[in-house]
């Protein structure tokens, strides 16, 4: 097994660390759940708007029309899917109930897993291809990816655990998001990385950024606010953004940002 593939596997596996942190101890309270949802929204917003979209637009040969167009397609695609899937909206979670509906929370967690997985898949390809061309650079990227995969695993496992009460189920769903990154690395390994077009990758990144922004503002943040009307969800958003920002600073400090 090649070193670049091993680095990609380790970076994706870091998601499980966050998953285990998300299920330790007692079943999360509503305040913890709201915080974790806000935390996830902060992660997604910062990654999408400060990392993925700018990187896509800066790709050589990528036109602003295509980049922003794919971003909008991602936004509209999410809202279209959201309309097709019947579900309870956030305000329904507190209507005539003091506790949120587990099914609604589980659905949100699944959508969160999908959004993070869509982000992690091209990220796995990028990690492998970069490490294949420059191993030292690959080590740095794998480290930064692993750092932000830990809170992503926590953000997925917390809501699933609260909805189901099952640690195995929570770890399973969190693991899926990490496996998506590993799958991306394996795919890049199978096609030797050279066939991955930078323009195609940039277009995918822009669309996924749109999906993640829509998921954050339409699903995660409103649901967190309904579960805990106090400031706790806002703290989660700020913490998520801060941790993601720190990982990006580390990335730039070691010279690969």
From Swiss-Prot:
Disruption phenotype: Mutant lacking this gene is impaired in its ability to grow in metal devoid environments. Mutant lacking znuABC and zupT exhibits a severe growth defect in zinc devoid media, is hypersensitive to oxidative stress and contains reduced levels of intracellular free zinc. GO terms for cellular component: membrane; plasma membrane. InterPro entries: ZIP, Zn_transptr_ZupT. It comes from the Bacteria. One of its GO terms (biological process) is zinc ion transmembrane transport. The chain crosses the membrane at residues 5-25, 32-52, 61-81, 109-129, 137-157, 171-191, 195-215, 236-256. It is a multi-pass membrane protein. Keywords: Cell inner membrane, Cell membrane, Ion transport, Iron, Membrane, Metal-binding, Transmembrane, Transmembrane helix, Transport, Zinc, Zinc transport. One of its GO terms (molecular function) is zinc ion transmembrane transporter activity. Zn(2+) binds at residues 123, 148, 152. It is found in: Cell inner membrane. Fe(2+) binds at residues 120, 123, 149, 152, 181. Pfam families: Zip (PF02535). It catalyses: Zn(2+)(in) = Zn(2+)(out). Induction: Expressed at basal levels in rich medium. Expression increases under zinc limiting conditions. Mediates zinc uptake. May also transport other divalent cations. Contributes to zinc acquisition during infection and plays a role in the ability of S.typhimurium to colonize the host tissues. Belongs to the ZIP transporter (TC 2.A.5) family. ZupT subfamily. PANTHER family: ZINC TRANSPORTER ZUPT, ZINC/IRON TRANSPORTER. This is Zinc transporter ZupT. It comes from Salmonella typhimurium (strain LT2 / SGSC1412 / ATCC 700720). The lineage of its organism: Bacteria, Pseudomonadati, Pseudomonadota, Gammaproteobacteria, Enterobacterales.
